[in-house]
Curated annotation (Swiss-Prot):
Protein name: von Willebrand factor A domain-containing protein DDB_G0292188
InterPro entries assigned to the protein according to its UniProt record, in alphabetical order: P-loop_NTPase (IPR027417), VWF_A (IPR002035), vWFA_dom_sf (IPR036465)
SUPFAM superfamilies: P-loop containing nucleoside triphosphate hydrolases (SSF52540), vWA-like (SSF53300)
One of the record's GO cellular component terms: membrane raft
Pfam families xref list: VWA (PF00092)
Gene Ontology BP annotations: aggregation involved in sorocarp development; cellular response to rapamycin; positive regulation of gene expression
Organism: Dictyostelium discoideum
Length: 750
C-alpha cells in the first residue's frame, strides 16, 4: 500500500464532467408533490392548489404525481396522466378538520416506488413536500435516504395554521426532517415560491435574490468558472461495502480570476452513499487550488443483491456559486470498479471454471471478469470469444490467472499494485460436446492447461488446474431447447455430486420482456437444481462495445464475489477434512496400541508387516476413491476380509451423520438495539459446529475481530451452544436446506 505522499505523486484522477443546467429546463422534469392533509394544513387549501396549477403552467412538458398523506396515504394524480385531468384531480385533495396524523414516511416510500417505475436517471426529478413539519409514523427515520436518486432534488414548503406555531417554527421542524435540503415558508404568492424553489434563490428573507441576479448571470451560465478534479484517496482497492474516500481539488478555470467565498460543492447522497458538502471559507484565486478529503458513508444494512443493484455508476455533485445563484452547475464523478474489488481478497487460490454450450457467452463472461482488474477505460480481450453460432472458437483448455496477466504487463497501474492479495485463476473450455469427460476430473486438476478438445486426456492431479467453483453460462434462448437443457442439467448434477455449489449465469436476457424473464426464472431455472441466490443475470459486453460500462462491471463483480466466496468455503472445508483425516489417523494408531502390536520406525508411507494400516489409507481422497471404485468393479470381498484390509472412513469412526451443504443467511448485529449492520449468505456443512461456523464468519468479516466477543443466535435471540453441530440445529427450521442465524456482539455488563 502506498503512503499518502507516494499516493499524491502517482494518483490518477477519476473522470469528472461539469455542465450548466439553465433554469428553463429543456428536458422533461418529473415533479412529485407530497401534501400533508392534517388539520394543521387546512387553511392552505387554496394556496396549495394554486401552487400546483401554476407549477404545471410554468413547466409545460413536465410529468406530475400528487400524493396526499394524513391518517392514510393516497395517490390522486399519477405520472403519464393527461394534463387536462389535473384540475379535476385537485378536487380530491381533502383536508381533515380534526385529525393531526401525517404519515410522511409511508408517503415518501410510495413516492419512491412511483418514481422508480416511471423515471430514468438521465431525467430530472424534483420532490416538493408541503408540510407542517411533522411525521407521525415510525417509518419517518432517514426519509431523505429513501428518495436518494441521481438527478433528484428535494424541496420543502412549510406552513401551519395553529395559533401557537409560527411559520418559522414550521420551517425549522420540516428542515429537521429534510436535513441539507431547501425549505422555505409556504407563502401567499405561489409564483414566488416556485421561483425560489426551482431557481435556487434564497429564503423568504432574501427572496428577490434570484430575480435580481438574473441580468448579470449570462456569462456564468455559459461555462462553469470552477474546475474540479477528484482522486481516490488511496490507490488500494477497497471493499464495495467500505466508506468512499475521495480527494477533491477545486480551482478557478483559466478565464476566472477567483471563486468567491461561500461557494458550495454538494456531493449528493444516493441509495448507496451518504452526501457531503464542501464550502469555501475564503476566496479561491487562480494558482492556489483548494483540496479536501471527503467521506461518503456506505449505507449499512443492505442485502447482498440490493447492495450491488444500488451501487452507483457515478457520484452527482452540484456547484452553488456564491455570486451566481441563478444557474445550477451540475457535474458527476465516474466511479472506477477497479477500486472496489476488496471482497475478492483471499488467503487461498481460487480457481473458477466456466462451462456451457457453444456460443452462450462463456469466454465473454471471463473477459468481463478479467476487465474488472483493468482500471483503464478500454476493454481488453484475454479469452477468445465466439462471435458466431455453431463454431468452436475455444478448442483447448485455457487456464489464466490474474497474477500471470499482471506479470505480463509492461506498466502496472497504481491500483493494480494492491491486487497482490487477490489470487484468482480462470479456466475456459470449449462448448459442451458428447465426448466430454466428467467435471470431477477438472475439479481434481486432471485436465491440464492446453488439453485439446479432440484429445482430452485425463492426467495426474495438478493443484494448478484444480477447479474450486463452476459457473454455468446459459443463454436465455437455451431454456427452450430440451437437448441443451438436458446437457446442462447433467453437468450441474455432476457438480452437485461432488458437494460443490454450482452458479448459474444467464446471458442474452435482454431479448425477453420483464414478464417473460420472470417466467423463465420461475419455471425453467428451478428445474436445474440451482438456488435462486446462486443465479445471476449477466449483460455481457457486445462486439461493438470497446469501453467499460460500470453497470455491467457490477454484475460481473457480484457473480465473481459469490464464486470467490464459495472457493473460500471449499478451501476451508478441504483443510478441515485433512485435519479430521490426521485426527482419525491418530485415533486408529491409538486403537492399535491397545493390541500391543510392535511397530517398527519407518517412513510415513512405508508399509510394515506388523502395521495394520495399509498404504492406500494414507493416499489422497481422490486416489482412495478411484482405488475403491476399481476394487469394487473387479471383486466382491467378504465382509470379514474387507474390514480387515481397509480401515473404515473417518465419518464412520467418529459416528458422524452424512454431511450435506446448506445455505446460511447471516445478520450481523453489533448493538443491543438489534440494528442489522450487514447481511450475507454463506455455504456451510451440516457437520460443522457452531464454533467453526463463527470462526469462518469472523474470518470473512475481519480476521482481527475477537471471536470471544461474539455469539451465534437464532433470530429469536436464542444463543446456540458452540459445540452443537449444524445438523442438530437445522431440525428446528422449516427449511433444513436454508436457515437464517444472527452473529451478535456480546453486551458487556457493568
Amino acid at each position: 500500500m502506498f503512503t499518502e505522499n507516494q499516493n499524491n505523486n502517482q494518483r490518477h484522477a477519476l473522470k469528472t464532467e461539469i455542465k450548466t443546467v439553465f433554469n428553463s429546463d429543456s428536458g422533461v422534469t418529473y415533479f412529485s408533490i407530497l401534501i400533508e392533509t392534517s388539520s394543521k394544513m387546512s387553511l392552505y387549501n387554496v394556496i396549495i392548489k394554486t401552487f400546483i396549477t401554476q407549477l404545471q403552467k410554468a413547466n409545460r412538458e413536465c410529468q406530475i404525481q400528487i400524493i396526499t398523506y394524513g391518517d392514510s396515504v393516497n395517490t390522486i394524480f399519477e405520472f403519464d396522466s393527461e394534463p387536462n385531468e389535473l384540475k379535476d384531480s385537485l378536487k380530491e385533495i381533502k383536508f381533515s378538520k380534526d385529525n393531526e396524523e401525517a404519515k410522511l414516511g409511508e408517503a415518501m416510500r410510495m413516492c419512491f416506488n412511483n418514481i422508480e417505475s416511471n423515471w430514468s436517471s438521465d431525467l430530472m426529478s424534483k420532490i416538493i413536500i408541503i408540510s407542517s413539519g411533522q411525521s407521525t409514523d415510525d417509518s419517518s427515520d432517514d426519509l431523505v435516504d429513501i428518495l436518494s436518486l441521481d438527478n433528484n432534488s428535494i424541496y420543502g414548503l412549510a406552513g401551519c395554521n395553529l395559533a401557537n406555531k409560527s411559520s418559522d417554527e414550521a420551517v425549522k421542524d420540516l428542515q429537521s426532517l429534510l436535513p441539507d435540503q431547501k425549505v422555505i415558508p409556504l407563502g401567499k404568492n405561489p409564483s414566488q415560491d416556485i421561483r425560489l424553489l426551482m431557481n435556487g434563490g434564497g429564503g423568504a428573507a432574501n427572496g428577490g435574490g434570484a430575480a435580481n441576479g438574473a441580468s448579470s448571470s449570462d456569462e456564468h451560465s455559459i461555462n462553469c468558472p470552477v474546475n474540479i478534479e477528484v482522486y481516490p484517496h488511496t490507490n488500494e482497492t477497497k471493499s464495495i461495502k467500505d466508506d468512499l474516500l475521495l480527494d477533491v481539488v477545486i480551482k478557478p478555470d483559466g478565464n476566472t480570476a477567483s471563486v468567491p467565498s461561500g461557494t458550495k460543492i454538494k456531493f449528493l447522497s444516493n441509495k448507496y452513499y451518504s452526501g457531503y458538502t464542501i464550502q469555501l471559507k475564503q476566496n479561491l484565486v487562480f494558482g492556489e487550488p483548494y483540496e479536501e478529503t471527503i467521506k461518503l458513508e456506505f449505507k449499512k444494512g443492505q442485502m447482498e443483491k440490493t447492495q450491488f443493484e444500488n451501487f452507483p455508476s457515478k457520484i452527482i455533485f452540484h456547484i452553488e456559486l456564491a455570486n451566481d445563484r441563478d444557474n445550477v452547475h451540475e457535474g458527476f464523478v465516474a466511479l472506477n470498479i477497479s477500486y472496489f474489488l476488496g471482497e475478492l481478497k483471499s488467503k487461498y487460490r481460487c480457481c473458477i471454471g466456466v462451462e456451457g454450450e457453444i456460443g452462450n457467452g462463456k469466454s465473454t463472461c471471463l473477459n468481463g471478469f478479467v476487465n474488472l482488474f483493468n482500471p483503464v477505460g478500454e476493454l481488453e480481450e484475454y479469452f477468445n470469444a465466439n462471435r458466431t453460432s455453431g463454431t468452436h472458437v475455444t478448442t483447448s483448455i485455457n487456464n489464466t490467472s490474474l497474477k500471470e496477466i499482471l506479470s505480463a504487463k509492461h506498466y502496472i497501474h497504481p491500483v493494480q499494485e494492491s491486487f497482490h492479495d487477490i489470487d484468482i485463476a480462470w479456466s475456459d473450455s470449449w462448448g459442451f460436446v458428447d465426448t466430454d469427460v466428467q467435471l470431477r476430473h477438472k475439479a481434481e486438476g486432471r485436465i491440464h492447461h492446453g488439453t485439446k478438445k479432440d484429445e482430452c486426456t485425463i492426467l495426474q492431479p495438478d493443484d494448478r488446474y484444480r477447479i474450486d467453483c463452476f459457473i454455468f453460462v446459459v443463454s436465455i434462448r437455451n431454456f427452450t431447447n430440451p437437448a441443451s437443457m438436458q446437457r446442462i442439467e447433467k453437468k450441474i448434477k455432476e457438480v452437485l455430486q461432488m458437494n460443490i455449489t454450482p452458479l448459474l449465469a444467464i446471458t442474452f436476457s435482454d431479448t425477453l420482456s420483464k414478464n417473460q424473464l420472470q417466467d423463465v426464472m420461475k419455471n425453467k431455472v428451478a428445474e436445474l437444481s440451482v438456488q435462486e441466490s446462486n443465479t445471476f443475470i449477466i449483460s455481457n459486453y457486445t462486439e461493438k462495445e470497446t469501453h467499460k460500462d460500470i453497470s455491467k462491471d457490477v454484475q460481473y463483480l457480484r457473480l465473481l464475489t459469490k464464486a470467490v466466496q464459495l472457493c473460500k468455503v471449499k478451501n476451508e472445508k478441504d483443510i478441515m477434512n485433512k485435519v479430521k483425516g490426521i485426527s482419525n489417523l491418530s485415533i486408529n494408531d491409538n486403537n492399535n496400541s491397545f493390541n500391543q502390536t510392535p511397530i517398527k520406525n519407518q517412513p510415513f508411507f512405508e508399509s510394515s508387516s506388523t502395521s495394520s494400516p495399509s498404504p492406500a489409507f494414507f493416499r489422497s481422497p481422490i486416489q482412495q476413491q478411484q482405488q475403491q471404485t476399481s476394487t469394487t468393479s473387479t471383486q466382491s470381498p467378504s465382509p470379514s476380509s474387507s474390514s480387515a484390509s481397509t480401515p473404515p472412513p473417518p465419518s464412520q469412526m467418529l459416528n458422524e451423520q452424512p454431511s450435506k451443504t446448506i445455505n446460511v443467511t447471516i445478520d450481523v448485529v453489533t448493538d443491543s438495539s438489534g440494528t442489522v449492520l450487514t447481511s450475507f449468505e454463506i455455504e456451510s456443512s451440516t457437520n460443522e459446529s457452531v464454533s467453526e461456523l463463527k470462526c469462518k464468519l469472523i474470518n470473512e468479516i475481519d480476521p482481527e475481530m475477537n471471536a470471544n466477543d461474539w455469539s451465534i443466535t437464532k433470530e429469536s435471540g436464542t444463543v446456540l451452544f458452540e459445540s452443537a453441530r449444524l445438523s442438530s440445529i437445522i431440525k428446528s427450521f422449516d427449511n433444513s436446506d436454508s436457515i437464517k442465524l444472527v452473529l451478535k456482539k456480546k453486551q458487556k455488563l457493568f
